[in-house]
Amino acid sequence: MAVSSEQHELSHFKRTQTKKEKFNCSEYGNRSCPENERSLGVRVAMYSFMAGSIFITIFGNLAMIISISYFKQLHTPTNFLILSMAITDFLLGFTIMPYSMIRSVENCWYFGLTFCKIYYSFDLMLSITSIFHLCSVAIDRFYAICYPLLYSTKITIPVIKRLLLLCWSVPGAFAFGVVFSEAYADGIEGYDILVACSSSCPVMFNKLWGTTLFMAGFFTPGSMMVGIYGKIFAVSRKHAHAINNLRENQNNQVKKDKKAAKTLGIVIGVFLLCWFPCFFTILLDPFLNFSTPVVLFDALTWFGYFNSTCNPLIYGFFYPWFRRALKYILLGKIFSSCFHNTILCMQKESE
């Protein structure tokens, strides 16, 4: 989720703000890009790192999308949630991260103000949508592990459809509504002239909307995930203590629950590690008079993006079915007739 890279200019714009609708931008460079102070070596290194992250995000999530869509054995409620999350992360990597890479390295926005709003709306929507999907997966695993007898009646395809509708519609309405109304900038002195004269894609949140974004986009879903994981972890430990008294099929269920709890714990841990610094900075920045350094904002933004890079790597590491599906994709076997009925895993591996 990109944030503005023009905080250091805002204080200067405040001192020269006028009530006129048109601004004389001559002293601000007439929207021309400032000279890039980074050396060629630094820029090449930044492009290489960011391009690598984009490559993994796009093709890792694309492999997940193809795997779940193609192989019938993977058509389960849980995997439909993972499929939708992979689509979200794929779109973030394909449509947002390349523009963010150019802006971050060149310290300039080349694509105009109208596209800036469209870009930032999708950036904000996809980032929050990805987070909402992680929360939905946690809810799914909560019922599967803590209430296994009720799972098939509670987590049905219609329920998954409603969850997915919520995951996409709420972030979309929030992002496009806030960005195109420019409500996020109400009360920020100098913002109008910053938009009119700067060479960036300036989006910065005031105290109200910075707090709202932090609470709705991070704190609430994050708290839900941590609480759910705590309950799952407690139940899996309780099951593990009774492992010696169980039959083999029950023993396998306990092992599956333990693995699911471990995987979910890693997913939540990576989410908190990647997104907390970015959201916390957005929350604090308006209270600090927008004094956060540009380089720090860019670094935290890419740290958040990295969550979408990590998701397919986590599932690929912990789920054998994904590794087998990826192998078949790379070998081109999915183009064979009826190969979609291939058994990728035993039932105990499929969840």
UniProtKB/Swiss-Prot annotation:
One term under GO cellular component: plasma membrane
Membrane topology per record: Multi-pass membrane protein
One biological process term in Gene Ontology: G protein-coupled receptor signaling pathway
Record keywords: Cell membrane, Disulfide bond, G-protein coupled receptor, Glycoprotein, Membrane, Receptor, Transducer, Transmembrane, Transmembrane helix
Gene Ontology MF: a single term: trace-amine receptor activity
Family classification: Belongs to the G-protein coupled receptor 1 family.
Descriptive protein name: Trace amine-associated receptor 2
Expression tissues: Not expressed in the pons, thalamus, hypothalamus, hippocampus, caudate, putamen, frontal cortex, basal forebrain, midbrain or liver.
Glycosylated residue positions: N24, N30, N289
Cytoplasmic face residues: 70-79, 140-162, 229-263, 323-351
Comment text on domains: In addition to the well known disulfide bond common to G-protein coupled receptor 1 family, trace amine-associated receptors (TAARs) contain an unique disulfide bond (Cys-33-Cys-197) connecting the N-terminus to the extracellular Loop 2 (ECL2), which is required for agonist-induced receptor activation.
Glycoprotein as UniProt keyword: yes
SUPFAM superfamilies named in the record: Family A G protein-coupled receptor-like
Function: Orphan olfactory receptor specific for trace amines. Trace amine compounds are enriched in animal body fluids and act on trace amine-associated receptors (TAARs) to elicit both intraspecific and interspecific innate behaviors. Ligand-binding causes a conformation change that triggers signaling via the G(s)-class of G-proteins which activate adenylate cyclase.
Sequence intervals crossing the membrane: 49-69, 80-100, 119-139, 163-183, 208-228, 264-284, 300-322
Gene of this entry: TAAR2
Cysteine pairings via disulfide bonds: C33-C197, C116-C201
Subcellular location: Cell membrane
Membrane side Extracellular: residue ranges: 1-48, 101-118, 184-207, 285-299
Record's keyword annotation contains Translocase: no
